[in-house]
Amino acid sequence: MILLEKFNSGQKIKQSGGYFAFIPNKINDIWKWESSDVNFLLEKANLELGELNSYADLIPNVDVYIKMHIRTEANKSSRIEGTKTSIEEDMSDIEDISPEKRNDYIEVHNYINALNLGIYKITSGELPISSRLVKEIHSVLLRGVRGENKYPGEYRISQNWIGGSMPSNAKHVPPPHFMLDELMSDLEKFMHKDDLKIPHLLNVRRKTI
């Protein structure tokens, strides 16, 4: 059993290369908390989700709205990787895109296709949120673009880091690659617990790994 108020998210452990990597503690357990603030926030989140569902029911053709939202999200998220296409260009045929922007166009459309694939697999019941689904989506993201030779559909096979020129001076060093299967398995089991009551932890854990 884990008491939320005393939960230690993990620790920095020295690796063979001399740098320190952050190793998250496992979370697939029974969670308890003493603060009433958590219950209040959960109730507020559930209420707002209910309002969102009600709003969706009022839209005559919600699928069109969702498709536009996915396209906008794909465009904005892809800019992190340096793509420079506009929403208008993303809605055009590839033949109408200037040659210097076609790679960016393909990256955005890969993002759209990956999101649609994930939504379909989950809503159709074909696959739950799982490592297998994450890998399938990843393979679509890297299809025919920069990074397509970097093991699409697989977890990373080497150490990465955020900020700095190497792990030793980085702002954040995630767990080493050989721990990913174990950590993702723990996250997957946690996501599918019947008594899960703190879903906001999922996104935090995903970004940590």
What are these regions (language model features)?
Residues M1-I209:
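FIC/Doc superfamily catalytic core
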